[in-house]
Amino acid sequence: MTIPLTPPSERARTNIRTEKMKRIMAVWFAVWIVMSANAQDALKKVYNEEINPIEQIDKALVEAKAGGKHVVCQVGGNWCIWCLRFADFITKDEAISKMVNDNFVFIHVNYNPRKSAGEEKTRQAAAMLKRLGNPARFGFPVLVILNADGKVLHIQDSSFLEEGQSYSAKKVLRFFKNWTPAALKS
């Protein structure tokens, strides 16, 4: 038999303090979850989950050919915070936005591998990945540069463009500059 070293009244106070700490921790955890969810919701959803990705790419290629541009496929989804951050980043930086608009047809190609999306969407996702050279191996978002004929010129792992919790303007601008039609002709 062990004899408690603290009197019963002290044990009761300790239990009360422990319960208060548990409640405080639970509240902080709930606040953190809500803030995390709101941070993702604050970014604009840029992926159209309803369209066929192959048809989306074909349409972009027609536009690119007419404009003498390349196509950039940002493959990912609204489920991917880094995909939404990249989309937000390139539209807010004037130099990057101009570089993209002048040289590329930029599309957000939705990727949803889940069977819950339906058999047709799963088939479309697999066909899109095959057509783009299996870019999913690099994670998301992944950037695929196509020439106006649909040939894959480059697949970019976007993690190399990151800086902190965002992206490096210098790296992103250099990436786009190196894959413009003019850069490949020189």
Indicate residue ranges for each PLM-predicted region.
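Short active-site neighborhood of thiol/selenol oxidoreductases, capturing the structured segment around
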Residues: G67-I81
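A short beta-strand-turn-helix
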Residues: P53-V71
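Boundary at the C-terminal end of the N-terminal hydrophobic targeting segment
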Residues: A37-D41
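Positively charged n-region of N-terminal signal peptides that target proteins for export
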Residues: R17-I24
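Typically the conserved alpha-helix immediately C-terminal to a functionally engaged Cys/Sec
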Residues: L84-M99
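Non-catalytic, surface beta->alpha helical segment in thiol-disulfide oxidoreductase systems
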Residues: F138-L184
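Sec-dependent N-terminal signal peptides
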Residues: I24-I33
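Thiol-based oxidoreductase modules, predominantly thioredoxin-like and allied folds used
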Residues: S97-R123
